[in-house]
């Protein structure tokens, strides 16, 4: 019997170097039954919702918008330096301790409210939805426009900063002329605290791609708007940037407008006419074909909130099942459903308004402020890392600082006596070498986060926290029983007759 086979000229060989094997943390990490609870203080922030105002040539406050990313960098204590009541928890010679996050609750204060944004010189020519006739453009058709931004609620939990994506101006292959549209490319950067999320106008570098400074609201017109790169973080082989996430977005278009100015990409026409429209006699040039929609986040409701409720991590989406390497955790959050802007009015001359004074608009100054209130609570589980050659090599390839912080290096004792200057930075001594002033470098020193120190806020008293009681109920455990209060019993005399008294004979 004969069979037809395809051309066998191609021969597939395995790669010359072995493929890197990515381990799952459950393969070399053992979980214990020891849990800790930690929580932050009440975290408050006040600022201007649109920009950083100047007062006497100084920045009086920061920009604070409900559509900004809040990136919390939570720093935990080193569990390898803990003093445990028993010595059989782990073997320091063959094992190391690490934290694993098992539960988290992100709480928001302040009432629900819709934030507004806008621009006093917004490029909105005319409504394009219900237009009776075309109007002629003028030199300046910008108007004052206000709108409510896209409604966003999301948070991402991981042990490294969250990855973001945005579109930015790219390098052109050929020299461009004035007025040509620049090429754009997708860039991936880390999301920092205070950066803007998408408000309905897209994720791009508005500072570089909006030369008119009138095509976006004030809070993003000079900013880089980012969006979390869920595709990249979901395919991360180590799974450190995103253990899990929760997201809720909502938006609809309220108005349809057209841009004023010259259209960069004209509607194509040919010798036989245009396939897109039929020309008319006596009609002027076509109106603008650059259309935009004004976003609106619509109704905010407490029925669709992802905050102020606990989340339990039974299985992470990546290979890292909640292990907080280097004793830190990053929480990236956005909540535009509490975006109310405070309007504060102050009299220009008098500290207090007189009762008999009449209202005059020029006598009052008006200010805008936005406030935020956060509170984070976590349940941490103590885990043991077995120091096998495979696990050490895997962690070293992922992040060598993990091994350095565990002090696993073998240092040979010096044979010769060494010199140590007391004041090495003094001008009377030699210039200090790099080894003399060696300081541990922060890998995220150029990034901006909201640092929260929790090194002294871990507790094993689990009865005092509602989050822990909910967690213990989920896993089928009970908290430590409290001693029963002392009870006092009283004899019930109801229904009993009083004893008769004997009469004495006189």
From Swiss-Prot:
It comes from the Viruses. The keyword Disulfide bond applies. Pfam families: Late_protein_L1. One of its GO terms (molecular function) is structural molecule activity. Self-assembles into homopentamers. The capsid has an icosahedral symmetry and consists of 72 capsomers, with each capsomer being a pentamer of L1. Interacts with the minor capsid protein L2; this interaction is necessary for viral genome encapsidation. Interacts with protein E2; this interaction enhances E2-dependent replication and transcription activation. Forms an icosahedral capsid with a T=7 symmetry and a 50 nm diameter. The capsid is composed of 72 pentamers linked to each other by disulfide bonds and associated with L2 proteins. Binds to heparan sulfate proteoglycans on cell surface of basal layer keratinocytes to provide initial virion attachment. This binding mediates a conformational change in the virus capsid that facilitates efficient infection. The virion enters the host cell via endocytosis. During virus trafficking, L1 protein dissociates from the viral DNA and the genomic DNA is released to the host nucleus. Belongs to the papillomaviridae L1 protein family. This is Major capsid protein L1. It comes from Bos taurus papillomavirus 4 (Bovine papillomavirus 4). The gene is L1.
């Amino acid at each position: 019997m004969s069979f037809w086979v395809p051309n066998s000229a191609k021969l597939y060989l395995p790669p010359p170097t072995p493929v890197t094997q990515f381990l799952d943390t459950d393969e070399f990490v053992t979980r214990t039954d020891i849990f800790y609870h930690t929580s932050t203080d009440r975290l408050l922030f006040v600022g201007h919702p649109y920009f950083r105002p100047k007062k006497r040539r100084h920045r009086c406050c920061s920009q604070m918008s409900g559509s900004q990313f809040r990136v919390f960098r939570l720093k935990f204590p080193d569990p390898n330096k803990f003093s445990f009541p028993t010595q059989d928890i782990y073997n320091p010679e063959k094992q190391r301790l690490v934290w694993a996050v098992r539960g988290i609750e992100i709480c928001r204060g302040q009432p629900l409210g819709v934030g507004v944004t806008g621009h006093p010189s917004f490029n909105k020519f005319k409504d394009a939805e219900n237009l009776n006739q075309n109007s002629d453009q003028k030199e300046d058709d910008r108007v004052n426009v206000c709108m409510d931004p896209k409604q966003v609620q999301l948070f991402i939990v991981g042990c490294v900063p969250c990855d973001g994506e945005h579109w930015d101006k790219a390098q052109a292959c050929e020299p461009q002329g004035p007025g040509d549209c620049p090429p754009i490319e997708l860039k991936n950067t880390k999301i920092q605290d205070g950066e803007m999320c998408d408000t309905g106008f897209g994720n791009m570098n508005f500072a570089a791609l909006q030369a008119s400074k009138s095509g976006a609201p004030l809070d993003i017109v000079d900013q880089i708007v980012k969006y979390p790169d869920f595709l990249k973080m979901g395919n991360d082989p180590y799974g450190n940037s995103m253990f899990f996430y929760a997201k809720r977005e909502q938006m609809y278009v309220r108005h349809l407008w057209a841009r004023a100015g010259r259209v960069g990409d004209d509607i194509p026409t040919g010798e036989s006419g245009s396939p897109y429209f039929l020309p008319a006699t006596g009609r002027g040039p076509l109106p603008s074909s650059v259309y935009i929609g004004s976003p609106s986040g619509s109704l905010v409701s407490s029925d669709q909130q992802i905050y102020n409720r606990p989340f339990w991590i039974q299985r992470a989406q990546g290979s890292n099942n909640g292990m907080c390497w280097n004793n830190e955790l990053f929480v990236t959050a956005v909540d535009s459903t509490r975006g109310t802007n405070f309007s504060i009015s102050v009299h220009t001359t008098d500290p207090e308004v007189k009762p008999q004074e009449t209202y005059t608009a020029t006598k009052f100054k008006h200010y805008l402020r936005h406030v935020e209130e956060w509170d984070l609570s976590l349940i941490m589980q103590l885990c043991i890392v077995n120091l096998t050659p495979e696990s050490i090599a895997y962690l070293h390839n992922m992040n060598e600082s993990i091994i350095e912080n565990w002090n696993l290096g073998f240092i040979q004792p010096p044979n010769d006596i060494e010199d140590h200057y007391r004041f090495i930075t003094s001008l009377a001594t030699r210039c200090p070498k790099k080894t003399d002033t060696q300081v541990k470098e922060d890998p995220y020193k150029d990034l901006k986060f909201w640092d929260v120190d929790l090194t002294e806020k871990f507790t094993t008293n689990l009865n005092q926290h509602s989050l822990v009681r909910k967690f213990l109920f989920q896993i089928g455990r009970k908290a430590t029983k409290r001693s029963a209060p002392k009870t006092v019993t009283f004899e019930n005399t109801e229904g009993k007759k009083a004893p008769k008294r004997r009469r004495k004979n006189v």
